[in-house]
Amino acid sequence: MPNTSFSNCCARFLEDPLAAVKVLVPSVAIEIVLHKKLWQKTSLRDLTLYLAIVNTYWFATTLNLSFLETPLFCNCGRQRFNWLNKIEIVVGVLGLDLYCEWRKRIIDNNGFVDGVLARSIWIPATVTAIQAVYLLPTLNKKAKQIDRTGHEDEQFPKAHRAYIGFETVKVVGLAVAGLRFGRMLTL
């Protein structure tokens, strides 16, 4: 018999409007420790490798969970995308910190960071924040209404299309970042 109190607790957490903040704050705290103890002492090549890995992982999970396995029931999909968003917050904090340390080292050595690479790092993190703060709470509210009444609100398809559009932009940014950092490792 499944533990319903645990699943209810998880569902409440996922639907909590402050859940993103509850994930972000400890993620930033952990990343500060990692930054001070690990990233500042890591070689530039290793930072590039970690950035390639983080962006490739984020790209693969987002592509798989958002596009390849999308035909889901409303409640299952809602929980899955809420969990994915919380994981993306953690990965986004890690990726941004790695990028900032990498960029600092490149510039300190009179190097150049092109704008496309910079945007390909910042766009996925920004999209994740927009999804966590606005799109997911809106979609959660509309999905609950559909579950309750059985009728779709006219705004639900628009919000859903916006979410899909943002996911597409995020996947493109992650692909560009992963490919660019991966290419740097071959030079």
Please tell me what each predicted stretch does:
Residues 112-134:
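Short alpha-helical packing/oligomerization segments
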Residues 2-18, 22-113, 150-153:
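Interfacial loop at the N-terminal end of multi-pass membrane proteins
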Residues 70, 128-146:
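Inner-leaflet juxtamembrane helices
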Residues 106-107, 139-147, 185-186:
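Membrane-interfacial segments
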Residues 155-179:
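Preference for long, well-ordered alpha-helical segments
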Residues 50, 54-57, 87, 120-123, ...:
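Physicochemical signature of membrane-embedded alpha-helices that form the seven-helix bundle of GPCRs
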Residues 141-160:
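Acidic interhelical loop/turn segments
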Residues 177-187:
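Juxtamembrane boundary at the C-terminal end of a transmembrane helix
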